[in-house]
């Protein structure tokens, strides 16, 4: 176990031997030239030992760089072989799939060509330029097609006249509903535009009989005029004015007409003013 531990150590225990050999080599090289051939042979041997030692050191350093360095090449080789085998199997399966696809495509092409040959529309197909050409002449419909159309129209005719009866019934119901609607609309009273007017009727002086003045005003009767409440309002110096309310229809009674009718009573009425005017 100790030996295995020392195999992975990076300490160079024999370095002094190689240092001594290298020193002796350089001493002999730098020494006198009259050396014998034996010395030259010894120097070459030393050089070879040094080179071999360096190679061993490099190998030992490379081998001790990782615990799995010795088993690396064999492991890589086995993994490569396994991968190649899996690729070959995958290649074979892909080839089978491609062959199946080619066979399916060839069958489809054969079937399509057979359908095109057997189709009557394919035989009568013309170039598309003839369909869109403005100079193309439209052939009149054949007599046979016209006869078939007439037969279809004859088949659609109801011999018992049920459609006509239904149309008459629908027309009668529609007319009846329109008549009822017109009668209902005629009975409904039309909206009449009306206005509420407050009049100020002023007398000549404080001696004017206000009861007689009010009776004169209320004696004015017009179509669309309705008199309302009234009261006496003091003006000053013992004089009072008549404030009376009325409702008029705008289309029938105008304010000017109403003032003219009231001012006809010159003995009692001095003037008529509109104090308020409101639409109803």
Curated annotation (Swiss-Prot):
InterPro entries in alphabetical order: eEF-1beta-like_sf (IPR036219), EF-1_beta_acid_region_euk (IPR018940), EF1B_bsu/dsu (IPR049720), EF1B_bsu/dsu_GNE (IPR014038), Transl_elong_EF1B/ribsomal_bS6 (IPR014717), Transl_elong_EF1B_B/D_CS (IPR001326)
Chain intervals with Acidic residues compositional bias: 149-168
Annotated region (Disordered), positions in chain: 113-171
GO terms, molecular function: guanyl-nucleotide exchange factor activity; translation elongation factor activity
Matching Gene3D superfamilies: 3.30.70.60
Residues bearing PTM N6-succinyllysine: 117
Residues modified to Phosphoserine: 37, 44, 60, 86, 106, 119, 133, 162
Keywords annotated in UniProt: Acetylation, Elongation factor, Phosphoprotein, Protein biosynthesis
Gene Ontology CC: cytosol; eukaryotic translation elongation factor 1 complex
Record-listed N6-acetyllysine modification sites: 17, 107, 117
Phosphothreonine modifications at: 129, 147
SUPFAM superfamilies per UniProt: eEF-1beta-like (SSF54984)
Keyword Protein biosynthesis appears in the UniProt entry: yes
SMART domains listed in its UniProt record: EF-1_beta_acid, EF1_GNE
Modified-residue entries (N-acetylalanine), positions: 2
Cross-referenced PROSITE patterns: EF1BD_1, EF1BD_2
Complex formation: EF-1 is composed of 4 subunits: alpha, beta, delta, and gamma.
Family: Belongs to the EF-1-beta/EF-1-delta family.
Its job: EF-1-beta and EF-1-delta stimulate the exchange of GDP bound to EF-1-alpha to GTP.
Name of this chain's protein: Elongation factor 1-delta
Taxonomic path: Eukaryota, Metazoa, Chordata, Craniata, Vertebrata
